[in-house]
Amino acid sequence: HAGGKFDGGGYKVSGGLHGVGASVVNALSTELEVFVHREGKIHYQKYERGIPVADLKVIGDTDQTGTITRFKPDPEIFQETTVYDFDTLATRMRELAFLNRNIKLTIEDKRERKQKKEFHYEGGIKSYVEHLNRSKQPIHEEPVYVEGSKDGIQVEVSLQYNEGYTNNIYSFTNNIHTYEGGTHEVGFKTALTRVINDYGRKNSILKDADSNLTGEDVREGLTAIVSIKHPNPQFEGQTKTKLGNSEARTITESVFSEAFEKFLLENPNVARKIVEKGTMAARARVAAKKARELTRRKSALEVSSLPGKLADCSSKDPAISEIYIVEGDSAGGSAKQGRDRHFQAILPLKGKIINVEKARLDKILSNDEVRTIITAIGTNIGGDFDIEKARYHKVIIMTDADVD
């Protein structure tokens, strides 16, 4: 291997699993050059398809330190493309700059388009949360920031609530985005739920008769970054998308809960807003459950429960059936006249129904037009969604291009 992660002194933490990254890049390149600026000298070596062209040699003096690597992907291996996408690389550079406070990263494209970007964030993951929430309405101005370390594991968490109804939690281990979460994310979520419930009880925001808020309740409108640095990460699988270290859960939970408890005590106005947002989410969850049960009872599989507005087709074969959703009864009338009754169904709806992107599930399901769509298509929603129950394999939405 070429990696420096195994000898104990090269890196404090590393994202590598096997220490073969440079070797793999070398093997997959038609040519690779390395310039190492070290101890006043520039050391150079060139490879072609993984084979050294010559021995390592000194080619000059330098007052800098660092490594320059140039490589050209092998088109015989990468047959689909060897062209790099600037925006994809820039997104990753920005992410790394957020995750490593005060580091400056530059990406420059010297091809025809000629573009260059620099990323440098003094706020680190706190700036990352602000970036993610830039188009939202935060309910507290400053993101919460927590950092601490234990047993060589460093934990950083930043979070901010907004007025939205979805949550965005991004977790990282040694700068690697753990898309599927893992023990560090579980530790954070557990601590968040417990601390908010404890604060709500102690300050009588949650009454004795109230049930505890669920994890789903306290995460509504939350944007959070959980980043840990671990000297020996154990990922589940080769893709590094989920962290498996059990101690990461305990340490993340401990570091975050202690600091977050202190934050809530020192910021009672913000704390109340957070708990009250959770209680509103809990009420909406209960209402949505009732609405879902109502929708479920009106099963789309029962012909008797199909919406009165629906002009159904005569075919019972979903594979050939299609439904046209049109605006208003007048459009519905025209569509009915022009359709083939055998396989084309028409569902006229009011023009402007509800913006489901900005509404809670209980509000969405209390809307007659939305319920009509759910019932007509037949797949149900959320955890009960079943594509096999679709009554039509083609859905055509016919609307004009105005605001509604």
Swiss-Prot record:
Main location: cytoplasm
Residue(s) at site: Interaction with DNA: K352, N355
Entry keywords, A to Z: ATP-binding, Cytoplasm, DNA-binding, Isomerase, Magnesium, Metal-binding, Nucleotide-binding, Topoisomerase
UniProt-annotated location(s): Cytoplasm
Annotated positions binding Mg(2+) 1: E327, D400
Reaction catalyzed: ATP-dependent breakage, passage and rejoining of double-stranded DNA
A single MF term (Gene Ontology): DNA binding
Single biological process term from Gene Ontology: DNA topological change
Family: Belongs to the type II topoisomerase GyrB family.
Further comment found in the protein's record: Few gyrases are as efficient as E.coli at forming negative supercoils. Not all organisms have 2 type II topoisomerases; in organisms with a single type II topoisomerase this enzyme also has to decatenate newly replicated chromosomes.
Role this protein plays: A type II topoisomerase that negatively supercoils closed circular double-stranded (ds) DNA in an ATP-dependent manner to modulate DNA topology and maintain chromosomes in an underwound state. Negative supercoiling favors strand separation, and DNA replication, transcription, recombination and repair, all of which involve strand separation. Also able to catalyze the interconversion of other topological isomers of dsDNA rings, including catenanes and knotted rings. Type II topoisomerases break and join 2 DNA strands simultaneously in an ATP-dependent manner.
Protein name, entry field: DNA gyrase subunit B
Organism for this UniProt entry: Bacillus cereus
Lineage, broadest ranks: Bacteria, Bacillati, Bacillota, Bacilli, Bacillales
Gene designation per UniProt: gyrB
